[in-house]
């Protein structure tokens, strides 16, 4: 007996569409940690083919941002001047990744698009090993993939 594999691209688009319809009346969405982790796994399977390892996710008040993707490494264990602090030192020091999300979003779609946006930065760090992981051509290469799933990739 053959097992049927779900088409993850189609199921993600349908899941986002259904969740958006279910939550369209909510004006101020407050995400919880289990919801953020669940949607991280869903978006990881649908947008990134499951290539991301789940980082620490923090939900709290952020000044001026809806989300951040952080790469933390312990520079106390490496000699000063070993690498530029503005460039992520892949292979030189162990790196811990974290995604920080604001505790309140104007709508549910803003929450999902912010989480997916930060996941693109995480993909740049974990898979592409982009030394800057900013809004460059690697970042915008995901725009068409977002569009097929009914999401928008903002700066």
Residue ranges and their predicted role:
Residues 118:
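Walker B catalytic acidic pair
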């Amino acid at each position: 007996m053959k097992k049927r594999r779900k088409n993850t691209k189609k199921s993600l688009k349908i899941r986002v569409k259904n969740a958006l319809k279910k939550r369209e009346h909510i004006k101020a969405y407050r995400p919880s940690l289990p919801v953020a982790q669940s949607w991280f796994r869903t978006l990881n399977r649908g947008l990134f083919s499951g290539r991301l390892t789940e980082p620490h996710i923090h939900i709290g008040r952020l000044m001026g941002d809806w989300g951040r993707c952080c790469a933390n490494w312990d520079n106390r264990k490496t000699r000063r001047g070993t690498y530029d602090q503005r460039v992520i030192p892949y292979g030189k020091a162990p790196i811990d990744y974290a995604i920080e999300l604001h505790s309140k979003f104007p709508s549910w779609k803003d929450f999902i698009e912010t989480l997916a946006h930060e996941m693109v930065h995480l993909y740049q760090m974990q898979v592409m090993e982009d030394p800057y992981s900013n809004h460059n051509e690697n970042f915008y290469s995901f725009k068409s993939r977002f569009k097929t799933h009914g999401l928008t990739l903002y700066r």
